[in-house]
Amino acid sequence: MTTSLDGRSVLVTGANGGLGEQFVRQALDRGAAKVYAAARTPRGWDDRRVEPLTLDLTDADSVTRAADAAPDVDLLINNAAIAPAGDHITGPEQELRRVFETNFFGTVRVARAFAPVLAANGGGTLLNILSAAAWVTLPTGYAASKAAAWSATNALRTELRGQGTHVIGLLVGMIDTPMSARWDVPKVSAASVVAQAYDAVADGSFEVLADDQTRYLKSRMSTPAEELYPWLDEQLGSFVP
């Protein structure tokens, strides 16, 4: 058993979801001393090393309280996100703002609140869970919000470098979780994604491409736009009405 997280204090946002639960459990398996399982409505856990923590990404006061309540965190997993059914880039602006408030502003809000905590604990690690949707032509607020979060992750890596914080972006296509159940497409397991994420924490990677589709997509990104985007449209036919 790998023990790459021996003694670390981990905080996972969105800990109630399928991917979040894997982040909590694998952190324990890898030797974490404490795991804050953060969610809007936290649930109980069967391991005393897990500390349920109330955290609503869309509420600045809630995020501040969470940072105050978890002063020993040295590994922050920014995992929480939403992908509403019927989301469309030309849909109601209120819905678009709701997606961005969680997936972009919420992600950045948590990173900013915990940056001083990470600095106080030796720099630590920030891992943002992104999506291959950041690089594709899905006409959704979700894809646009993940593109913004990808850019913010790279900016945070530069911004927090001086305090010794290691910033990782994880990009992946479809994960086999309840959030993706409505799509009948190939999916990678949550366990595999989380294992790759924690391996990246241990080896110092900047970026994790967590499935074959995302790795292939990254290899195509230098293709001229006139070829790349029609190809993407063809690949994504099952997602776009």
Region spans (language model):
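Substrate-binding pocket helix/loop in short-chain dehydrogenase/reductase
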Residues: D87-R97
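N-terminal Rossmann NAD(P)H-binding glycine-rich loop of SDR-like oxidoreductase domains
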Residues: N16, G20, V24
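C-terminal tail/cap regions
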Residues: P186-P241
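Rossmann-fold cofactor-recognition segment
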Residues: D47-A60
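Residue(s) in the substrate-gating loop at a strand-loop-helix junction
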Residues: S131
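Conserved NAD(P)H cofactor-binding loop of Rossmann-fold oxidoreductase domains
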Residues: N79-A85
